[in-house]
Each structure stands twice: as structure tokens, then as C-alpha cells.
Amino acid sequence: MKRIGLLGGSFDPIHVAHVTLAQSALAHLQLDEVQLVPAANPWQRAPLAATAQDRLAMINAAITGLPGLAVNTSEIQRGGATYTVDTILALPQDARYTWILGADQLANFCTWRDWETIVRHVDLAVATRPGSTLQAAPELAQALLEAGRSLRELPFTPMPVSASEIRQRLAQGQNTEGLLPEGVARHIAEHGLYRPA
């Protein structure tokens, strides 16, 4: 059975830390593929700056030529508010899936819509800082155990980059060299994204 990792996010824009995390998950978790899952309209976030079409184009530009990385457009195709549980339930059943998340997301995982359903269908992998200890809420640990699912650690050194910082730099005409994959930077420049209105 194929082993697929899922990395969700707004990817507004996708940056080098996203790509590095996906590649780390592919290798460390011994996955066959990592699919980047751009949100249509994330329920816990402010409205997105770039259109779905531009975010998809940037993701494709970022992963071109990188074996094992792919894009999953299910949330964008579905549209509306984006809930992880809906994405999970729509997955083909011919693979074993691992949802990749950050330690900050793990801390509030039990507030996600139908989180118990999510853990019945996917394993979890949490990107952790070197030297940190992975701790899940007792109710999450119990639900994973009952579902026969795992919670795995994905050692990952955080990178000093965030999409909001990149958007701010671009709006102010500042340098973003080294923060964006080359194809993403090119798409942003060619389409005038993230410039002040």
C-alpha cells in the first residue's frame, strides 16, 4: 500500500520552509509521496492575499523537478470553508495517509472540527524542534491508540521565514532572496502579487 504524506496550508505564498519540510517528511517518514494541500478558505485564518489559481501556480513552480512532491487540489476544488476532516474523508482508500503538522497545531488539534474522525483515518507526524519533546493531549493519545494510528516525530529545524513576513517584505519592495523557490519568486514578479493596492 502506498504511503502518502499530506501537508496542508494556505501557501500564500509557498516558501522554502514549506518545501524543506515536505522533503524532510518524505525522507524521514519513508513516504512514497508528499502532497501539498492548499486551503480554499482556511477557517482559522484571515482572507488569503493570492487567488487559488496563483497559489496553485506557485506550488507547482516550487515542486517542479522535486521527486515525490505533488499537489492535492481537493480543498480548492471543493471551495468554501476548509476543514481537514472533509479533506481526509474524501481521500481515495488505496493508500495509508499521514497528516503532517507543526507542534503549534498539535497543541490545539483537539479543537479541530471532528478531530476524532481525522485520527481514525490518518496517522499524524509532528514537525518538532531539535531537543524538544513531543507531547499530545491525553484525549488525542487515547484516540490514536484506539484507532491503531500513530503519532510520529518529524525532527525539523525551524527556518526564519513565514508567509506573512514575505508578503510584508514584498509589499514594501524589500528583498526576499533565499526565502522563496526561484519559480515562485518569478511568478510573484510576473503577476505583481503582494504589492500594495
UniProtKB/Swiss-Prot annotation:
The keyword NAD applies. The keyword Nucleotidyltransferase applies. SUPFAM superfamilies: Nucleotidylyl transferase (SSF52374). It catalyses: nicotinate beta-D-ribonucleotide + ATP + H(+) = deamido-NAD(+) + diphosphate. GO terms for molecular function: ATP binding; nicotinate-nucleotide adenylyltransferase activity. Pathway: Cofactor biosynthesis; NAD(+) biosynthesis; deamido-NAD(+) from nicotinate D-ribonucleotide: step 1/1. One of its GO terms (biological process) is NAD biosynthetic process. Catalyzes the reversible adenylation of nicotinate mononucleotide (NaMN) to nicotinic acid adenine dinucleotide (NaAD). NCBIfam families: nicotinate (nicotinamide) nucleotide adenylyltransferase, PRK00071.1-3. This is Probable nicotinate-nucleotide adenylyltransferase.
